[in-house]
Amino acid sequence: LGGSISTEGDGLYTEIVEVETWEDLEALGREQVEGKIVFFNEPMNPENTYTFHSYGHCVQHRWGGAVEAAKYGAVGALVRSLSLRIDDFPHTGSMKYDEGIPQIPAAAVSTRGAEQLSQKLKDGEQVKVFLQQSCQNLPDKQSYNVIGEIKGKKNPENIILVGGHLDSWDKGHGAHDDGAGVMQSLGVLELFKIL
């Protein structure tokens, strides 16, 4: 996950515990979490017609899961990928650390991987996970924005702003995030030209 620290040495090999909510984590407490990897497995709700509501609800575990797990002595965090599809592709995204809380490594697991892990745990198996990652945060680099402007003939002082970001995560090619957003922005501009 973007912002995660690396695993130290040869990585982590330890038991995992599964939670869906912050309340689940709290109910387990330090006694059942310490020294383990916390697996945040809250699926996105497919009933929402506006899927960003489902994403917005679950993203809290990716963003803050490592912090909350570390408060209970966890040594790592795994987060179910934020997708309605069941597939083998772990998604990336950003996460954070809080000052004064130990930093633990965090990673995403594909939705299919999450389903399989969860089933093994439900079957009563003691599941151990090997996690090794070599993350690094590099110094900031200057980047640039692409800006286009079309002045209206009528009411040119009024502004309609349309945008998307041109960067993408290193894991993918950027077609979805944010190639799709860029194409939608261009489509809006094309519609404005027609109007």
Predicted features along the sequence, with ranges:
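Second-shell loop/turn segments in exported
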Residues: 3-4, 14-19, 50-66, 102-107, ...
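Acidic/His- and Gly-rich active-site-bordering loop/insert found
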Residues: 110, 142-167
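Solvent-exposed loop/turn segments at secondary-structure junctions
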Residues: 23-24, 44-47, 82-86, 113-114, ...
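Surface-exposed loop and adjacent secondary-structure segments within mature catalytic domains
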Residues: 79-108
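Non-catalytic positions within long, well-ordered alpha-helices that form the structural scaffold/packing
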Residues: 67-73
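A non-catalytic alpha/beta surface segment that caps or lines the substrate-entry region
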Residues: 1-18, 99-149
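Alpha-helical metal-binding/catalytic segments enriched in His/Glu/Asp
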Residues: 61-62, 146, 162, 166-195
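Noncatalytic luminal/extracellular "stalk/propeptide" segments of secretory-pathway proteins
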Residues: 1-37, 41-49
